[in-house]
Amino acid sequence: MKTMKKYIKTAFFCSMYWLIVQLNIANLGTRIPDKYFRQKHIIFKSFNFEKHGKFWNKWFYVRKWKHKILDGHQLNRNIYDQRHLMTINSDEIEKMIIETKRAELIHWISILPVIIFNKGPRLVKYINIFYAMIANVPIIIVQRYNRPRLTQLLRILKRRGERHD
């Protein structure tokens, strides 16, 4: 019985830890100026093996499950609400590209706090590593899948004469 109480207590504290840490990381991430994400950073580059996002769909079937991911705006009102994308124009698409970069960065950073469990019991460590990966990697994959497609759409819009000022 003591062991069960200990596990329940540990699970509760781990859950609270992740809730507080991830909400704070997301909140801080929304405060990073857009100009940071307009620059070309290597971490946001689409690599050759990704084949403009096709790799992610071929190996992870992104199109089949990406719509099931909770929209971050439902948890944090500072996160870009994709539902307000009413018109497809270069300004809106550029904003979406910026937000894919922001989301990817936030979710990479959200994995890092798992190091606090490094000295903990093996089971606690493994469960928290699993949680950190399951909660963040799918979102990173979706961003890496969507961004090249949005970038291509932006190029098409600009080529057709719609200019972004």
Swiss-Prot record:
Report one GO cellular component. plasma membrane
The UniProt entry, under Pfam families, shows: CrtO (PF18927)
Can the keyword Nucleotide-binding be found in this entry's annotation? no
Q: Which UniProt keywords apply?
A: Acyltransferase, Carotenoid biosynthesis, Cell membrane, Membrane, Signal, Transferase, Transmembrane, Transmembrane helix
What pathway is it annotated to? Carotenoid biosynthesis; staphyloxanthin biosynthesis; staphyloxanthin from farnesyl diphosphate: step 5/5
Bilayer topology annotation:
Single-pass membrane protein
Segments spanning the bilayer are 126-145
Give the principal location in a single coarse category.
membrane
GO BP annotation list = carotenoid biosynthetic process
Q: What class of enzyme is it?
A: transferase
Q: What is the annotated localization of this protein?
A: Cell membrane
EC numbers on record? 2.3.1.-
The GO terms this record gives for MF are:
acyltransferase activity
Similarity remark: Belongs to the acyltransferase CrtO family.
Name of the molecule in the record: Glycosyl-4,4'-diaponeurosporenoate acyltransferase
Which species?
Answer: Staphylococcus aureus (strain bovine RF122 / ET3-1)
